[in-house]
Amino acid sequence: MTGEMMLKSKFARAAAMASGVAAMVVATASPAFATNKTVDIGYGYGTFIDDGDLFKVCDTQKDGKGVYGAVFYNSYFTTSGYKRVMTVSDGGDAGCDQKGYDIGNSGTYTFVVCWGFYPTSPFMTASMGYPCSHTGEFNE
């Protein structure tokens, strides 16, 4: 093998290795892609339906309180953190309530469901003392 061929071979291996490492970094840093997601909080539940980008909440208890959901969005392009961009609630009637919100891929979203009040932050859970749960981060 000539010196030039060996150099080309080493360069090709280095390029392949670099692209493999880059692919692994992207794969591990990405949020989950959107699929249907359900959050059960015992008093009711919330579901994100990917086909149509619908957010549905259902109150399953006749306790005088409702089930409240909120969608939070964190843009990849600004550093202001998560913002609540949509709310939906259900309580006191038959069936569930739902609302659409277009989920894109320029940031991450989380859907939070609480019993008795609207969520105020993107990762509220029962372990934090709230009757809430969330989907975790996702996008299209």
List each model region and its residues.
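Post-signal peptide N-terminal regions of Sec-secreted extracellular proteins
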Residues: 33-140
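N-terminal prepro-regions of secreted/extracellular proteins
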Residues: 1-47
